[in-house]
Amino acid sequence: MARVADYSIIADGWVVEASQDTISFEVPSTIDAGSRSVLGFMLQVNNLDDTNMTLRLNGQKVWTWQYSEGKRIMFFQEVIGAGILKPGTNVFSFDSSSGDFRFVQLSDIVVWWQANV
């Protein structure tokens, strides 16, 4: 059976942690669950103290990050282990922690996966 790459858009616009930190999205039944996937996203953070950030897919931690104060907008990609992404409904969630003020939002969240055709 041949394999092709495809993707699912989790969110296109900005998703602010304070108002929405969990997003459900669909993956077709043709996904090859034994293959790794790639998660890509824009991250904007404005913080006054060290901030820790965690992203999860289906409850499993897939990315963590920490940095000092400042305001930044960056794009990240992360390879996701095999078996984390599943056919049907999947859940993307994120949270952050800091000792002081922080503003965190993500956009253009996309996951690339392999499908059997």
What do these predicted regions represent?
Residues 1-117:
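Beta-strand-rich recognition domains
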